[in-house]
From Swiss-Prot:
Record's keyword terms, sorted: Acetylation, Cholesterol metabolism, Endoplasmic reticulum, Glycoprotein, Lipid metabolism, Membrane, Signal-anchor, Steroid metabolism, Sterol metabolism, Transmembrane, Transmembrane helix
N6-acetyllysine: residues bearing it: K267
Post-translational modification: Deubiquitinated by USP25; leading to stabilization.
GO cellular component, one term: membrane raft
Protein name: Erlin-2
Gene3D superfamilies for this protein: Band 7 domain
Subcellular location: Endoplasmic reticulum membrane
GO biological process annotation, one example: negative regulation of fatty acid biosynthetic process
Lineage summary: Eukaryota, Metazoa, Chordata, Craniata, Vertebrata
Lumenal side: 25-340
Gene that specifies this protein: Erlin2
Stretches the record annotates as Interaction with ERLIN1: 177-309
Length: 340
């Protein structure tokens, strides 16, 4: 009975071990490939739990999602004979699920070593061998990533279709310390030069700004002066027009006044001409004699009132020449009076 129990225990252990080795799990984003007796089987499996023959069948999980392969410490000799090292080169790639079997069959499950790592070493050495340290370290460094990606993808398209390179990232290479210090000094001087150039641009920009401000200020002053000059010219023109209008009005008034005076004089002359009739002259004579308070004596006094009209006119004319001949200049002869 003891032997039977031992056999059962051994059988149970063997069964459990067989079951444990037969059941396996494939993670999401991976494809399982199987080997039996060292030969790759054509069947593959997706994510999940699967069974296989225990002890004689083995499997490997191949990632089909994006993965990053790192190639470290890649030596590279430039055309000038300087040895430099790239610390780390990252290659982002993914494998198409349908191409897993062919790639694993041709390049094993560690296909990245044959297709990516070796190719990176080869392409970098070719690139460095035809370029100087200045070009590799500074001038063409930004092109290394894209050149490696294109070269890798071109070879993989013909050698391993289904393996896609998405991106390549290259770190700055390590160069000899003396050369590195020279480059740092050169970069420092270049930075100083750039700073000086930027300062010069700033100064030039400020000077240009000041010049534009001065130009704008001068234009403003000129415009103000032009406007002020225009205003003064308009004021003078207005004053001139006002003066011309006033002069014209004054001339018109004076002319009208002169015309009126001339007209008045003409009318007075015409009226006087019409008034100088014998009857009017005789009336004026009588008024003059009547208004004279002095009495004249002489033989011609009665005749003054008895002359004809023609004689009166002549006497009046003579009187007008001698201030009406009424003795305005000569002293009158007064008759002597007797006192009672």
């Amino acid at each position: 009975m003891a032997q039977l129990g031992a056999v059962v225990a051994v059988a149970s252990s063997f069964f459990c071990a067989s079951l444990f080795s037969a059941v396996h799990k494939i993670e999401e984003g991976h494809i399982g490939v199987y080997y039996r007796g060292g030969a790759l089987l054509t069947s593959t499996s997706g994510p999940g739990f699967h069974l296989m023959l225990p002890f004689i069948t083995s499997y490997k999980s191949v990632q089909t999602t994006l993965q990053t392969d790192e190639v470290k410490n890649v030596p590279c000799g430039t055309s000038g004979g300087v040895m430099i090292y790239f610390d780390r080169i990252e290659v982002v790639n993914f494998l198409v699920p349908n191409a897993v079997y062919d790639i694993v069959k041709n390049y094993t499950a560690d296909y990245d070593k044959a297709l990516i790592f070796n190719k990176i070493h080869h392409e970098l050495n070719q690139f460095c061998s035809v370029h100087t340290l200045q070009e590799v370290y500074i001038e063409l460094f930004d092109q290394i990533d894209e050149n490696l990606k294109l070269a890798l993808q071109q070879d993989l398209t013909s050698m391993a279709p289904g393996l896609v390179i998405q991106a390549v990232r290259v770190t700055k290479p390590n160069i000899p310390e003396a050369i590195r210090r020279n480059y740092e000094l050169m970069e420092s001087e270049k930075t100083k030069l750039l700073i000086a150039a930027q300062k010069q641009k700033v100064v030039e920009k400020e000077a240009e700004t000041e010049r534009k401000k001065a130009l704008i200020e001068a234009e403003k002053v000129a415009q103000v002066a032009e406007i002020t000059y225009g205003q003064k010219v308009m004021e003078k023109e207005t004053e001139k027009k006002i003066s011309e209008i006033e002069d014209a009005a004054f001339l018109a008034r004076e002319k009208a006044k002169a015309d009126a005076e001339c007209y008045t004089a003409l009318k007075i002359a015409e009226a006087n001409k019409l008034k100088l009739t014998p009857e009017y002259l005789q009336l004026m004579k009588y008024k003059a004699i009547a208004s004279n308070s002095k009495i004249y004596f002489g033989k011609d006094i009665p005749n003054m009132f008895m002359d004809s009209a023609g004689g009166l006119g002549k006497q009046f004319e003579g009187l007008s020449d001698d201030k009406l001949g009424f003795g305005l200049e000569d002293e009158p002869l007064e008759a002597p009076t007797k006192e009672n």
